[in-house]
Amino acid sequence: MEQPQEETPEAREEEKEEVAMGDGAPELNGGPEHTLPSSSCADLSQNSSPSSLLDQLQMGCDGASGGSLNMECRVCGDKASGFHYGVHACEGCKGFFRRTIRMKLEYEKCDRICKIQKKNRNKCQYCRFQKCLALGMSHNAIRFGRMPEAEKRKLVAGLTASEGCQHNPQLADLKAFSKHIYNAYLKNFNMTKKKARSILTGKSSHNAPFVIHDIETLWQAEKGLVWKQLVNGLPPYNEISVHVFYRCQSTTVETVRELTEFAKNIPNFSSLFLNDQVTLLKYGVHEAIFAMLASIVNKDGLLVANGSGFVTHEFLRSLRKPFSDIIEPKFEFAVKFNALELDDSDLALFIAAIILCGDRPGLMNVPQVEAIQDTILRALEFHLQVNHPDSQYLFPKLLQKMADLRQLVTEHAQMMQWLKKTESETLLHPLLQEIYKDMY
């Protein structure tokens, strides 16, 4: 069996070569331990001290005067010295892997699957090398640089937040709160953004959605290729727009149900007066729906029927007025909202914040609602700082989006009232009538 070899001057020269090939990517190590100040979750923002590791990385600085990340070697558990060959590794395992690859060493096979730890890592080189490979270590990782800057900053933010949570119970509570909201989101919403984007980008294991781009393909979809609810036949051509509108209503009603169940899972929502719960849902569901609609939209159209179908933007534009006018503003909002690149964990908190707005008309206990929303907003701000360390102004941008959504829903409600007068034969679902009544 090949015996372990210690680092040599030649190996140290190879290390210099590795750094050069990695375009000078900085090591993720530093000086004294740095923890998140306990004063506020906002300390992770751009207002942090310029000497913090997070600020250093945001400014693109390689050196760090403070802030050890305390990363463990993925192979043996020793303290990692940096990101080597694609994983965090200590100097010993980095050198071991480099020698094995460059000298093309072969070790005596071992079938015991030895546990590799710092104290015994030199005992079984075969299992040590196999673990390196299993973790994804590769000599090619050097040629592509080391850790991407965006990934590195996200990692640093997460680790810094984790350290902050250990020293600040309030931050730990916010983290647990965020996780609870996210789990409620995953539990109650059938179509997540992750699922929608995988379908839209063709990465889903499911069949590609059936594309509806004209009356003929709509008819095929109605015959059972897309929707589970079958119809006897399509209406006359001039009523196609009404038929599509009914389909939209059906989806909206189902989403209102999902939002109601989601709201029940928001801590302290169910302790509110029942009238306040109804009021919050009445004014909040459409804002939430239009925010979530962006997840299933791209520039070419939107997913329908739980991802089984895709209606093109051009087909929706071809509908007669006022139905085409109803849909277009939602598309415009979706494109801008998608540019923020939120994920489902962000959306979960954003949707919760929309529902728990203390300035809704007719609330009986405003302070109680505001207290819940304040917790949600603090959790959202902290979560965004960790999840999007490169986007310093994402939180205020989302607050602006909440205002934009309110305006969008106000215009939508007015359009529904106008539709009720001008399209007398077009029926609104009873639940939606209740929501729109005296809304704005």
Swiss-Prot record:
NR C4-type zinc finger locations on the chain: 73-93, 110-132
InterPro entries xref list: 1Cnucl_rcpt (IPR003074), 1Cnucl_rcpt_B (IPR003075), NHR-like_dom_sf (IPR035500), Nucl_hrmn_rcpt_lig-bd (IPR000536), Nuclear_hormone_rcpt_NR1 (IPR050234), Nuclear_hrmn_rcpt (IPR001723), Znf_hrmn_rcpt (IPR001628), Znf_NHR/GATA (IPR013088)
Expression sites (tissue/organ): Heart, adrenal and intestine.
Gene Ontology molecular function: DNA binding; DNA-binding transcription repressor activity, RNA polymerase II-specific; enzyme activator activity; linoleic acid binding; lipid binding; NF-kappaB binding; nuclear receptor activity; prostacyclin receptor activity
Limits of the NR LBD domain: 210-438
Subcellular location: Nucleus
Biased composition (Polar residues): 36-53
SUPFAM superfamilies to which the protein is assigned, alphabetical: Glucocorticoid receptor-like (DNA-binding domain), Nuclear receptor ligand-binding domain
Tree of life domain: Eukaryota
Segments crossing the lipid bilayer: none
UniProt KW keywords: Activator, DNA-binding, Metal-binding, Nucleus, Receptor, Transcription, Transcription regulation, Ubl conjugation, Zinc, Zinc-finger
Positions of the DNA-binding region: 70-144
Spans annotated as Disordered: 1-53
Any Gene Ontology CC annotation: chromatin
Example GO BP: keratinocyte migration
Modification note: 'Lys-48'-linked polyubiquitinated; leading to proteasomal degradation. Deubiquitinated and stabilized by OTUD3.
Function: Ligand-activated transcription factor key mediator of energy metabolism in adipose tissues. Receptor that binds peroxisome proliferators such as hypolipidemic drugs and fatty acids. Has a preference for poly-unsaturated fatty acids, such as gamma-linoleic acid and eicosapentanoic acid. Once activated by a ligand, the receptor binds to promoter elements of target genes. Regulates the peroxisomal beta-oxidation pathway of fatty acids. Functions as transcription activator for the acyl-CoA oxidase gene. Decreases expression of NPC1L1 once activated by a ligand.
Record note on quaternary structure: Heterodimer with the retinoid X receptor. Interacts (via domain NR LBD) with CRY1 and CRY2 in a ligand-dependent manner.
Family: Belongs to the nuclear hormone receptor family. NR1 subfamily.
Name of the protein in question: Peroxisome proliferator-activated receptor delta
Lineage, broadest ranks: Eukaryota, Metazoa, Chordata, Craniata, Vertebrata
Gene: Ppard
